[in-house]
Amino acid sequence: MAYRIAIVGGGLGGLTAALLLSRSGHEVTLLEQAMSFRTEGAGIQLSPNASRVLERLGLGPTLAARATATTRSRFRHFRTGRTITEAVLGERAAMRYGAPYWQIHRADLHGALQEAAEATPGLSVHLGQAVRHDEIIHQGDQLSVTPVPGPFDCVIGADGIHSQVRRWCFGAAPSRFTGQVAWRFLVDSAALPSALKAPESQVWWGPGAHFVHYPVAQGRWVNCVAVQEAREWTEESWSLPGEPGALRSAFEGWHADVQALTHHAEEATLFKWGLFDRRPLPSWHRGPVTLLGDACHPTLPFLAQGAAMAIEDAATLNLALTRFPSLEEALSRYEGWRRPRTTRIQRTSRRYGWVYHLGAPIAWFRDRAAPLARARTMDWLYRYDPEAPDQA
C-alpha cells in the first residue's frame, strides 16, 4: 500500500528515509526548518552497517569520490603515543562486512543525499518549514501538519534531539547532562606532518578525556573531536563557539601529535557543546506518528554510530511500511526490530564514555582487554543489515 507521508526534519536520517520511501512508491513530503540544507558541520564516520544502505540507494560512486576510505582505527595512549589496540579496515573490512568504512565531511554526505532527493520523482521538499508540536493535528482518520497542505497517512519525526514530533507524541522530556563536554574543529592538512594525514581514525585515551581525529574531504582537512569531563553545562547546542586557548589548555601535556592538532585548529570551525542523554522512550509511535534517529534514541558519540543509527532506522522503517499492509502493524514492527539494537548501542556508548577516560591503575586492565572487546563490538555493529532485521 502506498502512503502519504510527511517527514519532519531534513537531516541525514530524514533525507535517507525520504529517498527510500519515495523509491518504494510512497508520496513523501519533507519539511526542513532551515532555509537551505546544512553545509556546516564536521566529519562523520560511516561504518559498513550504514554505508551498505547508501550504496543500495545508488550513492556509492558519489560518496566514494567525496569520502576517505579508512584503512585502520588506532587507539593510543594519551602521553606516550603507544598503540593500545587497532583494527584493520580498508579492503579487509569491506570484504568482511560487505560494505566500506568511510570518513566523510557532513556537508559532502548531506549534499549527496540532497542531490538524490532533487532527482527523485514523488518527493516534495519544503525548506523554511519549522514544525511545532501543536501544528500536528490528528482527528479521527485525518492527519495534518499545519505548514503544508495535507492530509497525510503518516508523520515521521526526524527532527533531532529537540524533536517537536516527539513532544507531540509523548510530551516534553528533560535531557540529562552526562558530565562531559566536547569540542569539534577542522585542521588544514597542509599544516600537518604526514603521520597526521594518514587515512585512518586515531583515538587517544587519557584520564578524564579523549581525542579523536581523521581526515575528511579527500584529505584536505583533518576532523577533530575532543571530549573532556566537566561539572556543568547550561546549553544543549552544537553552535557555541569554542575558545582556542581553553582547548589547548585542556590537552596540555598530551602527545605532540594531539598538541599539533589543537594548535592548528581553524578557529572559525571550533565549537564546543555539552553531551546530553535521554532515557529510552517507552514507545516510538503514537497512532500514525513515529520517530527515527536522535528524535527517539539520541546516541552519545563514543561508538561513532549516531548518523549510522538514523540511516539504519530509515532503512528498516521503509521495509516495514512496504512489507505490512496495516500502518499500525508496520510501525509496531519497525519499533520492535529497532528498539533492542538502538537501546544496546545507547547503553554501550555510555559505557565507552567511561572506559575511554579511565586513569591508572585500572586503565592498565582496560588496555589489555581492549583488543578482544573491540573485535567483538565491531562484528556486532558492522555485520548488521537494517533491511534484513529478522536475521539480526
Region roles according to the model:
Residues M1-I5, S22, S47-D188, R231-A250, ...:
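Conserved N-terminal helical subregion
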Residues R4, E27, W221-C224:
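Residues at the starts of beta-strands that form the adenosine-phosphate
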Residues V8-R23, E27-M35, I156-G157, W183, ...:
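Conserved mid-domain beta->alpha element of the FAD-binding
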Residues P61, S189-K197, W233, D257, ...:
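Short helix-loop capping/hinge motifs at secondary-structure junctions, enriched
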Residues T71, L127, P207-A209, F271:
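Short beta-strand or tight-loop elements
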Residues P199-T234, P244, F251-G253, L275:
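Active-site substrate-recognition segment that forms the wall
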Residues S237-K272, L327:
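Flavin-binding catalytic cores
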Residues P371-A392:
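C-terminal auxiliary extensions adjacent to catalytic cores
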